[in-house]
């Protein structure tokens, strides 16, 4: 049986993930080697070694989650436990959190930085998938079905936004929206939910208005202002986007060559994180960019295909949530690099430097691989199962065939 299950894994998905991680590791070294020495005063391979360590840890988690039956993740006690730990971790950040980039979003443990918000993304996906799978029979009941998980998600998003980390809060909100829309409720319930959301927004509007200076800080307003014409703000909020444009245009079709980027020499401060795609464009040209987009697109499409094929509501919603996370995060990062949307500090999945993000993504991909394995295994089992002749029950057929 184990042999059959191992044969049922989607190895095209696994191969795409391996390619993304390997390519990402190479680009983290290329984009961070100058920054590490000139800006942080550490060895040129400092960020590379940290990313490699995260990749090993994430790879181990991927294997564990790929072998672990995903249905066990829907257990009520497990769900309550991870949700409680997540909320307590987010609250603890206000007391013990380390401030970096104007956000108190990290726990500093020794020489390591852990960002709980990254892991909360997966917790919310697991929670929503389990709750909505369980509520399928009464999901159209607004107050007992669809609404309570929405409230819980809003509380989590609120705690993250207060750090303030609006990028992560926005991603979780968008993932939740995708999952809620795919949870199976009727059009009438959607209308009721929109009305309820409108009422809640009206009620919290005075709080938003009174705290608008904290929400819309000078830096955030500047990002929106520079969106229309970054060259107008070339010495302030538009600087990173302009240097990103220079990197993309310098790369052209074939690029300047691996390791030959000019913009990573202090012109792009976040060359190994938010703006790593600009360095890829500069060094490897349009072919490098298309290679990454193709692989990310393949993973997302494969994820939604697995969700469509999965007959189990929990597995299907889980695959939708994981695929949505990759798609949304990729779009926000690429939109910021190309100047289509304001810069949010969101990294590019599998490619950008970031240990917490990489471990979370590989753990999520392990779950997706496990779902795909069960889907394929079930399909193969159905194909091999003989059809019962008219008037004969399935159990009788099994006895007839195998005795």
UniProtKB/Swiss-Prot annotation:
The chain crosses the membrane at residues 14-34, 52-72, 81-101, 109-129, 142-162, 166-186, 190-210, 286-306, 310-330, 331-351, 355-375. GO terms for biological process: cell division; cell wall organization; peptidoglycan biosynthetic process; regulation of cell shape. It is a multi-pass membrane protein. It is an enzyme of class 2 (transferase). It holds the Pfam family FTSW_RODA_SPOVE. Its EC number is 2.4.99.28. Pathway: Cell wall biogenesis; peptidoglycan biosynthesis. It catalyses: [GlcNAc-(1->4)-Mur2Ac(oyl-L-Ala-gamma-D-Glu-L-Lys-D-Ala-D-Ala)](n)-di-trans,octa-cis-undecaprenyl diphosphate + beta-D-GlcNAc-(1->4)-Mur2Ac(oyl-L-Ala-gamma-D-Glu-L-Lys-D-Ala-D-Ala)-di-trans,octa-cis-undecaprenyl diphosphate = [GlcNAc-(1->4)-Mur2Ac(oyl-L-Ala-gamma-D-Glu-L-Lys-D-Ala-D-Ala)](n+1)-di-trans,octa-cis-undecaprenyl diphosphate + di-trans,octa-cis-undecaprenyl diphosphate + H(+). Induction: Expression is regulated by YofA. PANTHER family: CELL CYCLE PROTEIN, PEPTIDOGLYCAN GLYCOSYLTRANSFERASE FTSW-RELATED. Belongs to the SEDS family. FtsW subfamily. Peptidoglycan polymerase that is essential for cell division. This is Probable peptidoglycan glycosyltransferase FtsW. The gene is ftsW.
């Amino acid at each position: 049986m184990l042999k059959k299950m191992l044969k049922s894994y989607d190895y095209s998905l696994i191969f795409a993930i391996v390619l993304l991680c390997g390519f990402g590791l190479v680009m983290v070294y290329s984009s961070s080697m100058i920054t590490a020495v000139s800006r942080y005063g550490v060895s040129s391979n400092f960020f590379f070694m940290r990313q490699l360590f995260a990749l090993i840890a994430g790879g181990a988690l991927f294997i564990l989650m790929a072998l672990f039956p995903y249905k066990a993740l829907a257990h009520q006690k497990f769900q309550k436990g991870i949700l409680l730990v997540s909320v307590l971790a987010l609250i603890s950040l206000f007391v013990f959190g380390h401030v970096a980039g104007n956000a108190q979003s990290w726990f500093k443990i020794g020489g390591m930085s852990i960002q709980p918000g990254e892991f909360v993304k997966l917790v919310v996906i697991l929670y929503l998938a389990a709750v909505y799978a369980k509520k399928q029979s009464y999901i159209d009941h607004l107050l007992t079905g669809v609404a309570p998980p929405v409230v819980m998600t809003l509380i989590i998003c609120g705690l993250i936004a207060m750090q303030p980390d609006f990028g992560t809060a926005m991603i979780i909100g968008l993932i939740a929206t995708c999952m809620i829309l795919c949870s199976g409720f009727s059009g009438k319930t959607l209308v009721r939910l929109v009305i309820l959301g409108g009422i809640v927004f009206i009620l919290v509007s005075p709080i938003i208005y009174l705290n608008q200076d904290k929400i819309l800080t000078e830096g955030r307003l500047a990002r929106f202002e520079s969106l229309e014409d970054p060259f107008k703000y070339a010495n302030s909020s538009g600087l990173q986007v302009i240097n990103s444009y220079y990197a993309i245009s310098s790369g052209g079709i074939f690029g300047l060559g691996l390791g030959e980027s000019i913009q990573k020499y202090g012109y792009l401060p976040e060359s190994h994180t938010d703006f790593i795609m600009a360095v890829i464009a500069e060094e490897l040209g349009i072919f490098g960019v298309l290679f990454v987009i193709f692989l990310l697109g393949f993973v997302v499409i494969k994820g939604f295909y697995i969700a469509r094929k999965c007959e189990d509501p929990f597995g299907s919603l889980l695959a939708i949530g994981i695929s949505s996370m990759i798609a949304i995060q990729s779009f926000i990062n690429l939109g910021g690099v190309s100047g289509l949307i304001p810069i949010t500090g969101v990294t590019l999945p599998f490619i950008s430097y970031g240990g917490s993000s990489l471990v979370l993504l590989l753990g999520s991909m392990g779950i997706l691989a496990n779902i795909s394995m069960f889907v394929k295994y079930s399909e193969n089992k159905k194909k091999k199962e003989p059809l019962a002749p008219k008037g004969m029950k399935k159990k009788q057929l099994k006895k007839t065939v195998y005795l």
